[in-house]
């Protein structure tokens, strides 16, 4: 079984059936991660390249591990020391990679649409590791895999996304994916951090955390970037925490046993209280493991064999 597409650029373009296929394929991949010997030869002879124009630890490492566990060769392009610094365009870099026989490229770039440009330029599969404020599809898929694993599905679930919605590619991809799978999505944060057009994506908008969290099944907490405060988008980090930090008291407003997610890295004491981050309802460490499984599934479905 393979995805009937060359690339993974975003969840906006995926059907519910394709999302389900990815999540179903990730389950046996996670079983592989639980073995003493994690390597399988599925992608032996394939070359997977990571090309990150923005800093990343989790996503880049997760993709590289996923490729290695599947038997592929990997190469990481360090943009700070590559021809990119000499003015080489994205298209030229892509053509160079194609000439090397690359099978898949994972790209993270500050410019929205960069993965799509790359995908139009080369025959290799392109996977979006995050582009500007546009999408971060693999983060959303690992979030969804975690939800499905813990809660069994999506139909009728109430999911709150808490924090800086305006600048978050994680939020956008989660919204596209969750709404397609039948979940009710609520976004909550300061008015200055919620884009006015977000309701057009079929979400409910809240500016009060207590109202938004009532009766939800999942709370996905987004990282607050300190530079947003310097731009005057909220008065201070202390004020943000007072109104929007996920504390044990606010968590009690959700359904008993509600799941807590965070894409990382966390600002403890600002967007999430340490007691919540380390509590029994948090699946933050599991998200990291699930990220490797989901990325293994994607590489298999895009560049693996037909069987």
UniProtKB/Swiss-Prot annotation:
Carbamoyl phosphate binds at residues 58-59, 108, 136, 139, 264-265. Its EC number is 2.1.3.2. One of its GO terms (biological process) is 'de novo' pyrimidine nucleobase biosynthetic process. L-aspartate binds at residues 86, 169, 223. Keywords: Pyrimidine biosynthesis, Transferase. One of its GO terms (cellular component) is cytosol. One of its GO terms (molecular function) is aspartate carbamoyltransferase activity. Heterododecamer (2C3:3R2) of six catalytic PyrB chains organized as two trimers (C3), and six regulatory PyrI chains organized as three dimers (R2). Belongs to the aspartate/ornithine carbamoyltransferase superfamily. ATCase family. NCBIfam families: asp_carb_tr, PRK00856.1. This is Aspartate carbamoyltransferase catalytic subunit. It comes from Moorella thermoacetica (strain ATCC 39073 / JCM 9320). The lineage of its organism: Bacteria, Bacillati, Bacillota, Clostridia, Moorellales.
């Amino acid at each position: 079984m393979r995805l009937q597409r060359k690339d993974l650029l975003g969840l906006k373009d995926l059907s519910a059936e394709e999302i389900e296929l990815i999540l179903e394929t990730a389950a046996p991949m996670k079983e592989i991660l639980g073995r003493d010997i994690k390597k399988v030869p599925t992608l032996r002879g394939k070359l997977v390249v990571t090309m990150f124009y923005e800093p990343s630890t989790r996503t880049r490492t997760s993709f590289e591990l996923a490729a290695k566990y599947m038997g592929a060769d990997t190469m990481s392009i360090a943009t700070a020391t590559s021809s990119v610094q000499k003015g080489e365009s994205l298209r030229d870099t892509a053509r160079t990679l194609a000439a090397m026989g690359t099978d898949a490229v994972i790209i993270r770039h500050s410019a929205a649409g960069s993965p799509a440009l790359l995908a139009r330029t080369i025959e290799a599969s392109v996977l979006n590791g995050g582009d500007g404020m546009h999408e971060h599809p693999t983060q959303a898929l690992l979030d969804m895999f975690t939800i499905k694993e813990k809660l069994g599905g999506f139909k009728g679930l109430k999911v709150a996304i808490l924090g800086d919605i305006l600048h978050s590619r994680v939020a956008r991809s989660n919204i596209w994916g969750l709404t397609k799978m039948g979940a009710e999505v609520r976004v909550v944060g300061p008015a200055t951090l919620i884009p006015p057009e977000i309701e057009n994506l079929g979400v409910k908008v809240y500016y009060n955390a207590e109202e938004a969290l009532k009766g939800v099944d999942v709370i996905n907490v987004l990282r607050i970037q300190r530079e947003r405060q310097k731009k005057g988008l909220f008065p201070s980090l202390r004020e943000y925490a007072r109104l929007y930090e996920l504390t044990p008291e606010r968590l009690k407003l959700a359904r008993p046993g509600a799941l807590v997610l965070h894409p990382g890295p966390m600002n403890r004491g600002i967007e999430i209280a340490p007691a919540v981050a380390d509590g029994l309802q948090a699946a933050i460490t599991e998200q990291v493991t699930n990220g490797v499984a989901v990325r293994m599934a994607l590489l298999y479905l895009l560049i693996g064999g037909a069987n």
